[in-house]
Swiss-Prot record:
Organism taxonomic ancestry: Bacteria, Pseudomonadati, Pseudomonadota, Gammaproteobacteria, Enterobacterales
Enzyme Commission number(s): 2.7.7.4
Name of the protein in question: Sulfate adenylyltransferase subunit 1
Function of the molecule: With CysD forms the ATP sulfurylase (ATPS) that catalyzes the adenylation of sulfate producing adenosine 5'-phosphosulfate (APS) and diphosphate, the first enzymatic step in sulfur assimilation pathway. APS synthesis involves the formation of a high-energy phosphoric-sulfuric acid anhydride bond driven by GTP hydrolysis by CysN coupled to ATP hydrolysis by CysD.
Region (G3): 113-116
Source organism of the structure: Escherichia coli (strain SE11)
Pathway: Sulfur metabolism; hydrogen sulfide biosynthesis; sulfite from sulfate: step 1/3
GO biological process assignments: hydrogen sulfide biosynthetic process; sulfate assimilation
Record region (G2): 92-96
PANTHER family: TRANSLATION FACTOR
Positions with a binding annotation for GTP: 34-41, 113-117, 168-171
């Protein structure tokens, strides 16, 4: 057993008491991102090593792997703790998103180590979608690069409000305060293009040597701020969904017998309590909450993030994908929306195409009306394009086959986040974040049906010699 873990269990008075203490610790999900070879995996390995989260057999295996695949000479190559795929180890890069768990006396952590290469943008977006904080690594020798800007943009696009700029490899610039100050100034200048409500912190460190990672560095007396671990342990995460109105997407209708009918799901935002008047959308039918059933019995109230089953006082028609909210809230269903899209397929996203989409348990079909622009994620400029390529990010106009109840993604990631599914292969080909739902009053009517637009796109793609015009060319 890990000696540090054994000591914690002994201090708590046994395994059961230790497990109870773990349940009451707060959990922080964060990701590491940066340019190639900035030391992301090494930093995670250092965090695991210095917080004594590595078992003896893992340490022994790490010694052997360092000799075979290591890049640090006689030293332990801590990056190998995270770079698990054979292809990653052979190339010395991170390809897939690697998740690791560790805990300290103050907090629990889930780390997502995301790829730095531009061709793996989709992997990074996947890792960032569940995180609350991003560690942006910058090589002290290179400063702020295009990939630093790209990762900052993707992180904020996916709703991350806390950025820790870790200026790594300070040992290779003689722990220069001037270098740290210059990079800090350069990043803050760039950050003026990002949303204004961000919490940005800077930590100079050396992941290889352990400076300012879990313990204060003696080599940088000019830095009096917290270590990286202290930042992670003390940062206050204010979840957006806690302050938002109630949203309960129905994932499953639970009917084990004739005497029970419940609606299971995870409360996406807000709170719900027994006796509360709720409304079902899109039908608009109202009822009262009779019971809130959980795995450990009935509760009087529930909060965002909790998996619950709601029992209503009335027998009404509710199915998977319906949304429950407070009865006094007016939330109109919309049939169009502008969506920030991260495209993940080899086949580009083009106007006129139709895809299945899934949002908060609801599955329907959407048509691409047009692409407003693609973002150059290296300098955040916008440019007009005919289609959105693999790993491209852009703002897209969608029309849905049926009215949907949507929130802006920055307000509610559950009811504002969607995925695109290819109708033939059933493969997820893209991720979308609702930028702005378009009400019926502002939506422009289309003179062409969904079938006509899809047929037009098919003809232009496969029979370009026919010279068919783009029916959406005027948009």
């Amino acid at each position: 057993m890990n000696t540090a873990l054994a000591q914690q269990i002994a201090n708590e008075g046994g395994v059961e008491a230790w497990m109870i203490a773990q349940q009451h610790k707060s959990l922080l999900r964060f990701l590491t991102c940066g340019s190639v070879d900035d030391g992301k995996s090494t930093l995670i390995g250092r965090l695991l090593h210095d917080t004594r989260q590595i078992y003896e057999d893992q340490l022994s295996s790490l010694h052997n792997d360092s000799k075979r695949h290591g890049t640090q000479g006689e030293k332990l190559d801590l990056a190998l703790l995270v770079d698990g795929l054979q292809a990653e180890r052979e190339q010395g890069i991170t390809i897939d998103v690697a998740y690791r768990y560790f805990s300290t006396e103050k907090r629990k952590f889930i780390i997502a180590d995301t790829p730095g290469h531009e061709q793996y943008t989709r992997n990074m977006a996947t890792g960032a979608s569940t995180c609350e904080l991003a560690i942006l690594l910058i090589d002290a020798r290179k400063g702020v690069l295009d990939q630093t800007r790209r990762h900052s943009f993707i992180s904020t696009l996916l709703g991350i409000k806390h950025l820790v700029v870790a200026i790594n490899k300070m040992d290779l610039v003689d722990y220069s305060e001037e270098t740290f100050t210059r990079i800090r100034k350069d990043y803050l200048t760039f950050a003026e293009q990002l949303p204004g409500n961000l919490d940005i912190r800077f930590v100079p460190l050396s992941a290889l040597e352990g400076d300012n990672v879990a313990s204060q560095s003696e080599s940088m007396p000019w830095y009096s701020g917290p270590t990286l671990l202290e930042v992670l342990e003390t940062v206050e995460i204010q979840r957006v969904v806690d302050a938002q109105p109630m949203r309960f997407p129905v994932q499953y209708v639970n009917r084990p017998n004739l005497d029970f009918r419940g609606y299971a799901g995870t409360l996406a935002s807000g709170r719900v309590e027994v006796g509360q008047r709720v409304k079902v959308l899109p039908s608009g039918v109202e009822s009262n909450v009779a019971r809130i059933v959980t795995f450990d019995g009935d509760h009087e109230e529930a909060f965002a993030g909790e998996a619950i089953t709601l029992v209503l006082t009335d027998e009404i028609d509710i199915s998977r994908g319906d949304l429950l909210l407070a009865a006094d809230e007016a939330l109109p269903a919309v049939q169009s929306a502008s969506v920030d899209v991260v495209w993940m397929a080899e086949q580009p996203l083009s106007p006129g195409q139709s895809y299945d989409i899934k949002i908060a348990g609801k599955k329907t079909r959407a048509r691409v009306d047009g692409i407003r622009y693609q973002v150059d994620i290296n300098n955040l400029t916008q440019r007009e394009v005919e289609n959105l390529p693999l790993n491209g990010i852009g703002l897209v106009d969608l029309t849905f086959d049926e009215p949907l109840v949507l929130d802006r993604y920055q307000q509610n990631p559950v009811t504002g986040g969607l995925i695109f599914i290819d109708r033939l292969s059933n493969v997820t080909v893209g991720a979308g974040m609702v930028h702005e739902p378009v009400s019926q009053a502002t939506a422009a009517p289309s003179e062409f049906s969904a079938f006509e637009l899809e047929l037009n796109a098919l003809v232009r793609r496969h029979f370009s010699h026919w010279g068919a015009r783009d029916l959406l060319g005027d948009k």
